[in-house]
Amino acid sequence: MYHNSTQKKHWTFLSEDEPLRRRIQANVRYRARIRATEKPRLSEIFSLEPHEELAICKYYEKRLLDFCNAFKPTMPKSVLGTACMYFKRFYLNNSVMEHHPRIIMLTCVFLACKVDEFNVSSIQFVGNLGENPLGQEKILEQILEYELLLIQQLNFHLIVHNPYRPFEGFLIDVKTRYPMLENPEVLRKSADEFLNRVALTDACLLFAPSVIALTAILSTASRAGLNMESYLTECLSLKDNQETMSHLLDGMRRLKILVSKYEPARPEEVAALKKRLDHCHSTEVTLSVHGRKRKGYEDDGYISKKPKTEEDEWTDEDFGDSL
């Protein structure tokens, strides 16, 4: 249950400022390590500010969703939600300058497939990237290198409660106990679109899955000219519990505001930032910072393989047409 979960205890925050604060701290920590290297000036030229890191993350979150939606065989929504949550959690405490979101994104999806028991082989997985066999092998090698780090940085909290299951539950409940809405299925398409927009925001770090699911249904109904507030008072028995009702409505209001004010990263901005990010990950800069522990904790015994040379690295274009 969500209310007893590690998600609620460790990964759900009371304020929108908390995820922002953690991202800034991750950026500051990494830039401090850059300044301590032999080439601080060279490294600082290409360093990213916190808001620039956020733009990069937004770009790769969208690519993550596109990859999952285009995946063959069809990927369950729960896997998409879990992967997106992993990605957001990882970059609360890590900088994109240290761990490139291109590979972290794929590692999040790969791990989510396992945790949510979506049975695809590693060959099937990388086959969705539109790469040649040699390229697929290189990408899979990197995914497997990063998998342990990802699990560590998630504090081994791998179970994610997504809004998709409660959404289906509420929809069934509306069908059986709310005759005022003749055909609740008419809400599904718009509600799915709302949940896709929610996935790009920090909502999963701020709201319970049930609140997100209920907001998807009621806001979709509202846009269709349907008032379902009586569903809350009658079917959910909140008529005599004004405090809970008020708290729920306030949460739904804040969630809708969060979704409405979301702004995707601008393509021209991302293009420039990606060039600087690639410089951050160039051999001359990264080796002096990370050494042998490039992909692991600084204080544990996990030693990664030697970083790939520049000619071995793969780019966003290696995703092919799958996105």
From Swiss-Prot:
Asked whether the UniProt record includes Lyase among its keywords, one would answer no
Record keyword Glycoprotein present:
no
Which Gene3D superfamilies does the protein's record reference? Cyclin-like
Domain of life the protein comes from? Eukaryota
Q: What is its main location?
A: nucleus
One GO biological process term is: transcription initiation at RNA polymerase II promoter
Q: Which CDD domains match?
A: CYCLIN_CCNH_rpt1 (cd20524), CYCLIN_CCNH_rpt2 (cd20525)
Compositional bias (Acidic residues): 310-323
Molecular-function GO terms, alphabetical: cyclin-dependent protein serine/threonine kinase regulator activity
**GO CC terms:** nucleus; transcription factor TFIIK complex
List the SUPFAM superfamilies. Answer: Cyclin-like (SSF47954)
Q: Report the locations given in the UniProt record.
A: Nucleus
SMART domains with a match to the protein in the record: CYCLIN
Q: Which UniProt keywords apply?
A: Cell cycle, Cyclin, Nucleus, Phosphoprotein, Transcription, Transcription regulation
Tell me the segments the record calls region Disordered.
Answer: 296-323
Oligomer status and interactors? Associates primarily with CDK7 and MAT1 to form the CAK complex. CAK can further associate with the core-TFIIH to form the TFIIH basal transcription factor.
Which family, according to UniProt?
A: Belongs to the cyclin family. Cyclin C subfamily.
Query: What does the protein in this record do?
Result: Regulates CDK7, the catalytic subunit of the CDK-activating kinase (CAK) enzymatic complex. CAK activates the cyclin-associated kinases CDK1, CDK2, CDK4 and CDK6 by threonine phosphorylation. CAK complexed to the core-TFIIH basal transcription factor activates RNA polymerase II by serine phosphorylation of the repetitive C-terminal domain (CTD) of its large subunit (POLR2A), allowing its escape from the promoter and elongation of the transcripts. Involved in cell cycle control and in RNA transcription by RNA polymerase II. Its expression and activity are constant throughout the cell cycle.
Known PANTHER family for this protein? CYCLIN
Q: What is this protein called?
A: Cyclin-H
Tell me what organism the protein belongs to. Answer: Xenopus laevis (African clawed frog)
